[in-house]
Amino acid sequence: LTQIALISDIHGNIPALEAVLKDIKQRGIETIYCLGDLIGKGPHGDIAVDMVRTHCQQVIKGNWDDFIGKETDDPVLQWHQHRLGSVRLQYLAELPYILEFMMSGKWIRLFHASPRSVYERIQPWDDQEKLETLFHSSPLCGDPRIADVAGYADIHNAYHQHLDGRTLFNTGSVGNPLEMPEASYVILDGIYDSEDPAPFNIQFIRVPYPIEQAVQDALESGMPSPKEYILEVRTGRYQVRKD
């Protein structure tokens, strides 16, 4: 049996990332995949990138990781770019978009927001037709098969549902979670790289972390307009939709 931890949307929140990595380690899980948005919103994207590179076997690109490399006049984005530096920006620019593998006889596809784009936002309350497109392949995918299990991130909203015998789930967010102010991640349980049907499980984990430390980090970092971010990590509610 293989266990794979899926973390995502860290957004430069190091106390949250540390708490999640500690929980994963305590469970004896050695394989970690990151589904993007390492940076942005929170103060320490630089440390988040370095930690993810150290601890994660696979990393895919999120919307923040994608647009942060583009030239901009936005002072907030410039602050994050400066903080990251050219080597980390290059690393983010080169990340792949999709992870695909067999597990317990199921074809699993993981991506940040949709199989088509890091900028397509799909919510659990969208209509079934739209949700079903998350199982589809796209030119970004390495394989044309329809996924049996599709997992994504982006919306900071952990959920799990079955659609016509297929399984859709969202990891939620490590560093900027909604619903409740606790870090969220997912564990996949199954037989990796096996085409034979076998037990398969998706587990959702919530990890409390020192929120006031994240607040302190934001205040001490000199990041522009930390107020919204601080309210978000304290309450688990978006203050402005700049995500």
Residue ranges and their predicted role:
Residues 11-16, 40-42, 64-70, 116-118, ...:
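Active-site environment of divalent metal-dependent phosphoester hydrolases
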Residues 18-19, 45-47, 122-123, 162-165, ...:
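Short amphipathic alpha-helical segments
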Residues 2-93:
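Core catalytic region of metal-dependent phosphoesterases/phosphodiesterases
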Residues 31, 125-133, 165-167, 171-177:
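Metallo-beta-lactamase
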Residues 3-11, 107-114, 168-172:
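Active-site-proximal beta-strand elements of phosphoester/diester hydrolases
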Residues 28, 87-160:
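His/acidic metal-ligating clusters that form di-metal
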